[in-house]
Amino acid sequence: MRLLFVSTPVGPLGSGFGGGVELSLYNIAKEVIRRGHDLQIVAPAGSRWDNLPIMQISGNLQIIAQSLERETPITMPSNPLLANMWDYVRQVESEYDLVVNFAYDWLPFYLTPFLKTPVAHFVSMGSLSDALDQIIVQTSKRFSGTIGFYTPAQAATFPELTSPIYYLSSGIDLSLYQFCSQPKEQLAWLGRISPEKGLEDALAVANSTNISLKIMGKIQDESYWQKIQQDYPNAPFEYLGFLSTKEMQQVVRECRALIMTPRWVEAFGNVAIEALACGVPVISYSRGGLASIIKDGKTGFLVEPDSVAGLIEATKGLNQINRQTCRDSAEKVFSLEALGERFEKWFVDILNFQS
């Protein structure tokens, strides 16, 4: 197949501003190339990824959906990057069999009927916007099988979707993550530093248990970051910045557990499978797609949402988790090969539907 991937417009690939969908796009791209498909990626200027074919487009970045209210009207900045990216798609679509949209934004769905080449939409978050909900539902009805999600829990946040709905999960290059059987007395927290990620609860755990917390990720909300540090002045933590996969796994693999504290319905949680690949159990609120990744009591613990006491209690049970079981779980379900099979089947099905 000749595939055109269109990235998120909230930041350059490799910057971390796109969150988990950046890693998903990267891994899917690597796997479809390995499978012999022709691929071009359309992405914001400044995107940097090793040896992947990227057409860089200039323009002003789109505001991330998480920062907006549900009722906020659809808007774009002047010289909008999102519109510029899709104008490029319009110019070159005839050269491709399928366009794959990774942007969680209204415009690509709206433009779908005006393009001659079929468009697959990989929806990377749960419901956040009334206007976006409406057009996703309309697209699922009008263009059968073109909407894909990470998990059923994520898809369930959208009303009245039309079948078939594709649940594609995620996957990683397991060779990049080294197993560690003997961790240090430390915990990890990994993700965008933004209110919906609930980092303050992980700091509360560190403060209560006196176990050092290693924090990694892009600071997306500086005022929030400053406030939670002030709220927990004595919590033992170290902020390490936004790290490459190689650097990140070197830290995570030496931790007793990864703590995940989402305030919202996580569509998936790529950092969870990255931790499991290192043999690191995951302690998480039982919310969204994370409940489909973590096997409670075997590869980590699922805790009542927003219960810091539950997180603290779970840290006491980490010795009963076999870290090899965590690694085995990642290898069985979340390999690049399995990811490639799921996406390739989806792409073929769409082309069959459209024909």
Listing of model-derived features with the role each one plays in the protein:
Residues M1-Q354:
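Catalytic cores of nucleotide-sugar-dependent glycosyltransferases that transfer UDP/GDP/TDP-activated
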